[in-house]
Structure formats: C-alpha cells, structure tokens
Amino acid sequence: MSSQTVNPPGYPTRRLAGRSRSALEIPVLDREPGPLGRRIASLPGEGHPVWTYVLGIIIAFVTVASLSLVTGIVVTRVLLHVQGVAGADESPVRFLARHRSGGLTDASLVGSIMAGGVVLPIVAVVAAVIALVAKHWRLAGFLLFALAVESASYRTTTLLVHRHRPEVHRLEKLPVDASYPSGHTAASIAVYCGVALLLTSRIQNRGAQIAIWAVAILIPVYVAFSRMYRGMHHPLDVAGGVIVGVAAVSALVLVTRASGSAAR
C-alpha cells in the first residue's frame, strides 16, 4: 500500500488565502508605523480605519502645504534678496532660452506632457483601479492621494506665494506670477517616484530595483529641465517642486501605515 499524505480539512483554503494575502502585500506600506503614525492611528478612537485615513489625508495636506508655503516665503522674501542669488537663479533659464532648437523644443513639450494635468491623473487612476480590483484599498488610496495632496499643496502655494516667471520668451501661456513652485516637477515625483517606491518594495532583484529608481529619478529631472527650457520656472522653483513631491509621498506612506495599524 502506497503512503499518501492527507491534508487536514481546510488546508488548501488556508494555503491559497496565504498566497492571496502575500500577493497583496506592499512591504513599504504594510510596515508598523512609528510613534507619529501610531498617534495618527489613535486619533479617531474606536472609529472605522477609513476615518483614520481621512484624518491622515487632512493632516498630510496641511503639513505639506505649510512646508511648501514656508519654503516659498523664505525663497521669495529672503533668498532672492541676497545679492547675486536672483541673477544666478535666472541665468540657467536664459542660457536654455538662447540655445533653443526645434528638436529640443519638441523634447521639452514631451517632458511637460509626461507630468501634465492629463497624463498623470490618468496614470494614477488606472493604477488605483488595478489596486482596487486586487482589493487593496490602501494602495489605491496611496496612488490617488499622493498626487492629490501634492496638487492641492502646489495650488495653495501659488495662490499665496507670488513669484514672476523667468524674464525670457515663455513657450506656454500660464499665469505670470505663479512661478513657485514647479507643479510639474512635484507631480512627477509624487506619481513616478511613488510608483517606484511601491514596486521596489516588492521586487527583491537588486538590478531591477536600481533600474526602476533610475527611471523614476530621471523622469522628474527631464521634466524639470523641460520646464526651465520652456521659460516657465527657475531652478529654485524646481527645487521647491522637489520638496513638495517628496513630502507628499512621505506623508502618504505615513498615513497609509497609520490606517493599516488602525485596521489591525
């Protein structure tokens, strides 16, 4: 008689369920939050984890917008009044404007479109829908709200911090006093670097991680140069965009971990 292992009742179900949970795990979002994240998780008391998430999003927006506003005030009211800073911030844009060509102008348009108000929302929504189909609502929220927090913080800053765009021929007709910060740069970081963070959190292959991050970093760099080439932003505006984008991604990681902790 041949021996045959008989699994206990329910064994296959548990195994498949384990695989399903593993397939949904995003380590960077599923880690236990630090002290600040635990504090956010405890704020709604015994309420539903969704309330933790909603409250966290509000805190994230207020924090990122405040950081952007303070940085913008320092740039426009302090740094630019230091002798030589304003000229140094304008000169790279003038250099790029003097060396424009048909091919470079077309390339700058592509860079702007990649981080524009049409492409990035589509990328974020499609990725979020995929996450929802996989029944990972916190991942979907991260993908959507990283861009939403970035965009709201950027818009708030441009309304309250007024800086004129570079004094060169500008290739786009946008409000002239909304130079700081670069929303395209911030949005490209929020989406492309946010997705890279999620992917490299799951992928164990070191070479693949390096390749993903290389692309995710090069895209915002390309976008930043495109915006300066087109006469829309100064280098300090781009730096402000980097701050907003990185802050938005960091805040959403914290909020997502906090909501996960509340759910557990």
Which residues are covered by each model-predicted region?
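Membrane-embedded catalytic cores of phosphoryl/pyrophosphoryl-handling enzymes
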Residues: R170-R264
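C-terminal ends of transmembrane alpha-helices
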Residues: G72-V74, R155-R165, Y222-R230
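Membrane-interface loops
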Residues: L80, A86-G87, I122-V125, I130-A214
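Terminal transmembrane helix and immediately flanking juxtamembrane interfaces
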Residues: M1-L139, P235, A239-R264
